[in-house]
């Protein structure tokens, strides 16, 4: 018994739930079937309904009254007795006297008036119904007028049994209901499970009831059972449904799509429920109509309802809004804002592309609601694809400094940088060769003859003179600083060598050897490589300046630190007929010493090479960098290991000069 009471309470609570927007007819009819099958459940059901009538919510009270009315109309005398005994009528009177919700109050007055009349008034079987009516009437309550087409509470019995199975649905008062028949109401085993022949009127059953005995597990729903009671499809019904839909569409257009609480407004909730109900009715009407025009309009209205309800569900769930069909009737309202969507999308695209090249704000005010903006975002990709040929080409600037140049486009040419000069294909070794080859230049004017004796040149020295012509004249005017004599001269090498030559002109060569070595060697070693290495082109300009001092083409003056040995600085013209095989090694060594910064004074090989080295300087020969400083004697030791007799030195000098020139011209050094 306890389990049956609990199941009855759960069923009543479900049928009268506060979450329902309207009566749950399926649950109500299941409760009626349960009471008709098990009479002793009527007590538990009535008790649960009375408890729901005492609820504070007017919605729950209204649903409980609807369930009670359904039970009274579809159940027998045992339920009528429980309603009179459990003082449900007294509870209904209290609700009316408390001036509760007007809808609940009117519902109670209609039910009490119809019940007292159906049960025979004060002389009837259950006078409790009349007493409740009389109490309300004496308290000054005016009952509403009775409807002439209202269904009776107790349907009178039929005069003859039907010959066929009656067609009908729930809600139709059963014929002859209330007449107790033999075997009626006997509990059946396994109730709730469809049984063979259950619900089908049997021979001798007596008075058949329309739709009575439907099991709870049946797939036939209430909305399908009441399809025959739905009114036919007409233009007026379609227009009324469309008015409700348009009103809901206007309200959804005004709310924020991102605000879920906005759709919980009472008016919006009521309109949504009416639209859902209208959609169900419309589908039922479409199945029964034969007019093509009405069918087309009905299908169009159904599509619009479907789109509108999907939009409401999307806002309520916070999901993205669905894309509307362009031809749907609902999209007519947003047609004007949608016309400007291509322009706004173009403005968004152009502003996003030019965002890196222009500080202009990219916000475009179109005056549309957030819902229209959502639709535009959905259509942007297709709109851009359709307008890809008509959109102007957008210039994308990747330079971050072009923000200012965009505003000053007229001054763009003034800010353009000039083209860089063409690179000079020079290597570090080539620059060093140009610097050190200055000492190999031969003067064109003969210097003053030396007072010291010198051996005559070897025989055959003039035979090969024509083989080594003087190079370009631009290199014949320069004399190495340490090769200059003590005669006063004009300042030479003003760019790069003025400091060294002025110092030599002031002090001359009369100073002791040690002081001259300190002054000349230190200044020669430091300024010349730095200035000549970094600026090789000014050296050619310096060499073109003529010298006014007479020079001897057959000899060089001794350097300041040179020794006083005879024939140490006198060198004949380097044209010897010696063999190349004997002095090939000396020629390589003389080239190293000629290209070094300080050269030993007693080494005739270094000075012999300077006479005919102009050709190699003009053609800029290639010398490996690892051979430039191979024989450099930094400390200037005078041990004499490089000093050789004059005759041999002359031959080696001639050979080394010629061989060095040939080896440099050939691009490599012969050893």
From Swiss-Prot:
Positions of post-translational N-acetylalanine modification: 2
Compositional bias annotation for Acidic residues: 372-382
Tissue expression notes: Ubiquitously expressed.
VHS domain segment(s): 15-144
Domain GAT: from-to ranges: 229-317
Location(s) in or outside the cell: Endosome, Multivesicular body; Cytoplasm; Early endosome membrane
A Pfam family hit: VHS
Residues spanning the membrane: none
GO annotation (BP), single: protein transport to vacuole involved in ubiquitin-dependent protein catabolic process via the multivesicular body sorting pathway
Keywords: Acetylation, Cytoplasm, Endosome, Membrane, Phosphoprotein, Protein transport, Transport
Compositionally biased spans, kind Low complexity: 334-362, 407-417, 483-554, 647-663
Segments of this protein annotated with the region Disordered: 320-620, 636-671
Residue positions, PTM Phosphoserine: 147, 596
Molecular functions (GO terms): phosphatidylinositol binding; ubiquitin binding
InterPro entries named in the record: ENTH_VHS, GAT_dom, GAT_sf, TOL_plant, VHS_dom
Gene Ontology CC, one term: early endosome
Annotated PANTHER family: TOM1-LIKE PROTEIN, TOM1-LIKE PROTEIN 6
Family statement drawn from the similarity comment of this UniProt entry: Belongs to the TOM1 family.
Role of this protein: Acts as a gatekeeper for degradative protein sorting to the vacuole. Plays a role in recognition of ubiquitinated PIN2 auxin carrier at the plasma membrane and further to its endocytic sorting. Binds ubiquitin in vitro. Might contribute to the loading of the ESCRT machinery.
Designated name of the protein: TOM1-like protein 6
Gene this protein is translated from: TOL6
């Amino acid at each position: 018994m306890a389990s049956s009471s609990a199941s009855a309470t759960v069923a009543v609570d479900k049928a009268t739930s506060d979450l329902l927007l309207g009566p749950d007819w399926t649950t109500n009819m299941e409760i009626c079937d349960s009471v008709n099958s098990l009479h002793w459940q009527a007590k538990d059901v009535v008790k649960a309904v009375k408890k729901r009538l005492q609820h504070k919510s007017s919605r729950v009270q209204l649903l409980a009254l609807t369930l009670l009315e359904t039970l009274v109309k579809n159940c027998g005398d045992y339920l009528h007795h429980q309603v009179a005994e459990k003082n449900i009528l007294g509870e209904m009177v209290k609700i009316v006297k408390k001036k509760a919700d007007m809808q609940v109050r009117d519902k109670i007055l209609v039910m009490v008036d119809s019940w007292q009349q159906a049960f025979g008034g004060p002389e009837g079987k259950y006078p409790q119904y009349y007493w409740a009516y009389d109490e309300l009437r004496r308290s000054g309550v005016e009952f509403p007028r009775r409807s002439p087409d209202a269904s009776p509470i107790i349907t009178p019995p039929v005069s003859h049994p039907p010959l066929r199975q009656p067609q009908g649905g729930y809600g139709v008062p059963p014929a002859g209901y209330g007449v107790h028949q033999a075997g009626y109401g006997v509990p059946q085993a396994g109730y709730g499970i469809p049984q063979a022949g259950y619900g089908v009127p049997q021979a001798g059953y007596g008075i058949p009831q329309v739709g009575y005995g439907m099991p709870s597990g049946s797939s036939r729903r209430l909305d399908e059972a009441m399809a025959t009671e739905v009114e036919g499809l007409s233009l007026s019904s379609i227009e009324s449904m469309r008015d409700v839909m348009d009103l809901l569409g206007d309200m959804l257009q005004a709310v924020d799509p991102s605000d879920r609480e906005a759709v919980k407004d009472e008016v919006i909730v009521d309109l949504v429920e009416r639209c859902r109900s209208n959609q169900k009715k419309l589908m039922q009407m479409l199945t029964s109509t034969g007019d093509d025009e009405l069918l087309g309009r009905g299908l169009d209205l159904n599509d619009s309802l479907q789109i509108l309800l999907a939009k409401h569900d999307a806002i309520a769930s916070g999901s993205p809004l669905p894309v509307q069909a362009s031809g749907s009737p609902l999209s007519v309202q947003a047609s004007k804002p949608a016309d400007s969507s291509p322009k706004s999308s173009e403005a968004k695209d152009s502003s996003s592309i030019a965002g890196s090249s222009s500080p202009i704000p990219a916000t475009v005010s179109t005056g549309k609601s957030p819902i229209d903006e959502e639709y535009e975002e959905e259509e942007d990709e297709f709109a851009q694809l359709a307008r890809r040929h008509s959109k102007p080409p957008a210039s994308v600037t990747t330079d971050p400094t072009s923000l200012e140049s965009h505003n000053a486009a007229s001054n763009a040419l003034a800010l353009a940088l000039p083209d860089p000069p063409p690179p000079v294909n020079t290597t570090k070794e080539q620059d060093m060769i140009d610097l050190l080859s200055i000492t190999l230049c031969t003067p064109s004017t003969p210097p003053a003859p030396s007072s010291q004796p010198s051996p005559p040149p070897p025989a055959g020295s003039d035979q090969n003179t024509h083989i080594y012509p003087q190079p370009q004249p631009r290199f014949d005017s320069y004399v190495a600083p340490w090769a200059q004599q003590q005669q006063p001269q004009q300042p030479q090498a003003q760019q790069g060598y003025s400091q060294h030559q002025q110092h030599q002109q002031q002090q001359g060569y009369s100073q002791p050897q040690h002081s001259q070595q300190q002054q000349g060697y230190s200044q020669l070693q430091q300024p010349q490589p730095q200035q000549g290495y970094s600026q090789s082109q000014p050296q050619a300009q310096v060499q073109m300046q003529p010298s006014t001092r007479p020079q001897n083409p057959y000899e060089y003056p001794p350097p300041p630190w040179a020794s006083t040995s005879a024939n140490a600085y006198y060198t004949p013209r380097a044209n010897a007929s010696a063999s190349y095989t004997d002095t090939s090694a000396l020629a390589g060594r003389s080239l190293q010493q000629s290209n070094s910064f300080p050269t030993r004074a007693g080494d005739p090989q270094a000075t012999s090479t300077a006479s005919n080295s102009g050709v190699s300087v003009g053609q800029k020969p290639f010398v490996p960098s690892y051979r430039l400083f191979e024989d450099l004697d930094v400390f200037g030791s005078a041990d004499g290991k490089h000093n050789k007799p004059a005759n041999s030195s002359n031959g080696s000098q001639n050979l080394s000069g010629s061989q060095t020139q040939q080896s440099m011209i050939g691009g490599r050094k012969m050893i």
